[in-house]
């Protein structure tokens, strides 16, 4: 297999397209702005839908709607944006809908810094919103793992979503 050299965020976006992502809803925020930038240029060419939302809150609620309609939906953000998305994430978790959320973490509390960090791991694994729910978190240690985990994330989300739909019938 031929090796390719990619920037991490662009590799994640390309992996999502190759994984069959139908739609991406996002809002630019450092350090993940390359993800929506790449998706805007390449997802429509693959037959998908890209929409830059007016806010992080709008983006996660668009994912909620798309996932509810059976689409392979994805969004991305970084720490402050993920915090803004928490209410929408609780709705998605409560409805047991499949989606992929990429968090390009950055350091510090509040708005923090623009350097990478891992402070959001606790929020992601323990639920940042109200209610009793957990989200499945895949935490890559390098770009190759990030690419592999994107495909895995879509596959797991589909399995969980289909299973929860069968349970409700």
Please annotate each region the language model reported.
Residues 1-127, 134, 151:
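Thiamine diphosphate
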Residues 141-142, 157, 161:
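Phosphate/diphosphate-binding loops
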Residues 91-92, 155-159:
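A general structural signal for short secondary-structure junctions and capping/turn motifs
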Residues 103, 139-142, 168:
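Short, structured patches in soluble enzyme cores that scaffold and shape functional sites
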Residues 111, 133-145:
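Flexible, glycine/proline-enriched loop segments at strand-loop-helix junctions
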Residues 159-169:
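Residue-level detector of conserved catalytic or cofactor/ligand-binding positions
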């Amino acid at each position: 297999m031929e090796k390719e050299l990619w920037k991490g965020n662009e590799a994640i976006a390309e992996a999502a397209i190759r994984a069959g992502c139908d739609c991406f809803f996002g809002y630019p925020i450092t350090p993940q702005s390359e993800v929506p930038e790449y998706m805007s240029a390449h997802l429509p060419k693959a037959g998908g839908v890209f929409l830059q939302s007016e806010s992080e809150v709008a983006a996660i609620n668009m994912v909620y709607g798309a996932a509810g309609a059976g689409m392979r939906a994805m969004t991305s953000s970084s720490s402050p944006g993920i915090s803004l998305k928490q209410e929408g994430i609780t709705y998605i978790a409560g409805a047991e809908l499949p989606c992929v959320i990429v968090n390009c973490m950055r350091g510090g509390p509040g708005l923090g810094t623009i350097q990478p960090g891992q402070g959001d791991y606790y929020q992601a694994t323990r639920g940042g919103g109200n209610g009793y729910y957990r989200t499945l978190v895949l935490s890559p240690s390098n770009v190759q793992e990030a690419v592999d985990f994107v495909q895995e994330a879509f596959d797991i989300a589909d399995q969980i979503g289909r299973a929860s739909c069968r349970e409700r019938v």
